[in-house]
């Protein structure tokens, strides 16, 4: 089995509930989405990066893994594009190294997500709002439905799970409200089922105002009081 990787590096987690933790990032190449705020365009194509055998990639990860690393973060690109190779790689890490396995994904394919889930410790389930332009308007509901299924799968398998929504200048309050009701009312997700709910403001282009971020916060708070507005720390610090 071969896997295409854009980069492997150690830094601090710059997003989400584990912000500030020492992390080994494994960025897989290829992504089917085209979000306007994407900050890793060099990893969008399946021809980006370098191809490795799974065992070869594992050895590089092993040599790159520093002491006291909190987790190995599989990111992209979109890791689910290479789910078969990722499964083998994650299995080797679990058996031979033992750090927490974290998946950072758009959750565009719930079947691939479910395939990987037994090997995951931490799942970030990201919901793309329509203004992200991740997919065309006609297919956006499919993307959301898959992410909702992934959320349910992760919770049912008792994984550490949190939700992230990226907010831009054109993000819709009504759309977020519908999404929140689907999560907490229609799906009956309990607040204790998830580790956190992160609102992440877009950085660099189409940035939302503070007032907009607070309005989004207010939509979520009645359902989930531990909602947090957290920008990308690594962008603020100027690190990878």
PLM feature spans:
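Short, conserved beta-strand segments within well-ordered enzyme catalytic domains
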Residues: 25-27, 71-73, 102
């Amino acid at each position: 089995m071969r896997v295409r990787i854009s980069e492997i590096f150690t830094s601090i987690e710059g997003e989400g509930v584990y912000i500030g933790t020492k992390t080994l990032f494994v960025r897989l190449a290829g992504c089917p989405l085209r979000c306007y705020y994407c900050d890793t365009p060099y990893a969008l194509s399946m021809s980006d990066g370098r191809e490795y055998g799974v065992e070869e990639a594992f050895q590089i990860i092993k040599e790159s893994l520093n002491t006291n690393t909190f987790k190995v973060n599989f990111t992209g690109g979109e890791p689910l594009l290479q789910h078969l190779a990722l499964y083998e790689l994650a299995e080797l890490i679990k058996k031979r190294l033992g750090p927490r396995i974290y998946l950072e994904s758009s959750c565009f394919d719930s079947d691939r997500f479910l395939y990987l889930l037994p090997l995951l410790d931490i799942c970030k389930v990201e919901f793309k709002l329509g203004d992200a332009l991740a997919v065309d308007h006609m297919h956006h509901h499919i993307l959301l439905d898959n992410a909702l299924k992934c959320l349910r799968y992760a919770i049912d398998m008792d994984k550490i799970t949190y939700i992230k929504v990226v907010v831009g200048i054109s993000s819709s309050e009504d759309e977020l409200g519908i999404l929140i009701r689907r999560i907490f009312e229609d799906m009956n997700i309990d607040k204790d089922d998830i580790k956190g709910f992160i609102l992440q403001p877009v950085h660099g282009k189409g940035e939302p105002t503070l007032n907009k971020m607070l309005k989004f916060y207010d939509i979520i708070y009645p359902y989930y009081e531990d909602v947090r507005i957290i920008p990308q720390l690594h962008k603020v610090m100027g690190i990878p």
